Regions:
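Residue-level signal for secondary-structure boundary elements
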Residues: 75, 90, 102-106, 140, ...
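Surface-exposed polar/charged interaction patches
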Residues: 77, 81, 101, 302, ...
Length: 395
């Protein structure tokens, strides 16, 4: 309890979060729409936004200029605010945006979406998403696109490509009845980005869906990390890249195709944060285009093998779980244990368990007798009462 409130802990990604139980009940009573596992494999391509899909920060492409500020001074002030107050840098820029807009421009959701409409995109981005989805269809793979960004959701929703994404995870504002931004509704920083990978993995896409904590068998996971691609450009993407890498997924660093500055991707490659890097050129036939298509091809082949593996595993589990097979399984284990026994104490222990089983097939009796003949340690104690009694019962 905290100040009279009952708090409930739950795990979200790598975090433990405490929630007011009253709020928790309201959230958990809601029916969430979840994505279920399909018969075809699914590849999730997750993107940062600024300098990954767009050549510059979204705030620097209209908003900062509209409040009469310079890009460099805006970020200097915002980052200074964060440093002076031990404040999250993303909360600091959101606060700075609201404060600077006051008395100068309307700071509404519509205004932010209008700024987003002016955001420039890298070459090929506008046709990329459909083209890659269609390629997946040809290979028997479902391709889904997701945004995981510290930028503003409202601005991304104003871009030409907003409707191409299954879900946009980004920082956003709470608005009053007049549509004016009042307070952060969601803030996403470089570490909290990882929780959304778990949501994508399990199909629990709503940010309030506690189902992200549910246990899923490996074969029931909708999008395993091995089928995820993360495309980013900087340090803020490192936690997601590292997580995906650790589970055999694919992380791609991109750099501006005009400046050709590869310093960041070289550093990320050196630090084992990314597996590949390419220019942020999304046109057909580009390095990035060919790389992602190769990943889709590999996924199609690999998931066929995984499907066979899970079928075999399911058959084995089903076989072992049948009542008629439980004793057979126990007999098989004891026979193997006896064959591998290397001490008198161990042999006597195994014999005591074998004596409890009354029904042996001719083949099993033959196996047991062969073991006694070949294992010199067993052979030397054949006259011991328990061993002699057991083998006599096999006659």
């Amino acid at each position: 309890c905290h100040k009279g409130k009952l708090l409930y802990p739950f795990v979200l990604g790598s975090y433990v979060v405490f929630v007011n139980l009253r709020n928790l009940n309201n959230i958990m009573s809601k029916v969430f729409i979840r994505k279920s596992k399909e018969s075809k494999p699914v590849v999730a391509i997750c993107y940062d936004f600024d300098k990954t899909l767009s050549p510059d920060d979204m705030q620097a492409q209209g908003y900062i200029q509209s409040v009469g500020d310079e890009v460099e001074s805006f970020w200097k002030e915002s980052n200074g605010l964060a440093e002076e107050n031990e404040m999250d840098q993303n909360l600091a820029y959101m606060f700075t945006m609201i404060r600077k807009a006051h008395g100068k421009v309307l700071f509404t959701k519509k205004a932010l979406m209008d700024y987003g409409a002016k955001v420039q995109l890298f070459p090929g981005v506008e046709t990329w998403f459909k083209r890659i989805r269609d390629y997946g269809v040809d290979k028997g793979v479902i391709v889904e696109h997701y945004i995981i960004s510290s930028g503003l959701k409202e601005m991304i929703e104003g871009t030409k490509v907003a409707n191409e994404f299954e879900k946009i995870y980004a920082s956003s504002f709470y608005y009053d009845k007049d549509g004016v931004a009042q307070w952060p509704a969601q803030v996403i920083n470089y570490t909290s980005k990882t929780q959304f990978l778990f949501r994508i993995e399990k199909g629990t896409l709503d940010v309030n869906d506690f189902g992200v904590n549910d246990y899923f068998k490996p074969e029931d996971i909708r999008i395993p990390f091995r089928n995820m691609v993360y495309i980013g450009d900087s340090d803020t993407d490192i936690p997601c890249m590292k997580l995906i890498n650790s589970y055999s997924g694919h992380s791609i660093g991109v750099y501006n195709p005009e400046t050709k500055d590869k310093r960041k991707v070289y550093k990320m490659m050196e630090d084992k944060r990314i597996k590949y890097y390419t220019p942020a050129d999304y046109t057909e036939g580009s390095e990035l285009d060919e790389l992602v298509k190769t990943i889709i091809n590999t996924t199609a082949s690999n998931e066929k093998l995984m499907s066979i593996h899970y079928q075999n595993k399911q058959e084995q589990v089903s076989h072992n779980g049948q009542p008629d097979n439980l004793e057979e399984k126990e007999k098989e284990k004891l026979i193997m244990d006896l064959e591998n026994s290397n001490s008198f104490k161990q042999t006597h222990s195994i014999i005591s368990k074998l004596k409890k089983i009354k029904d042996w097939t001719l083949e099993e009796k033959k196996q047991l007798k062969t073991i006694a003949e070949k294992n010199t340690q067993i052979c030397s104690i054949m006259k011991d009462g328990d061993v002699a009694s057991f083998y006599s019962s096999l006659e």
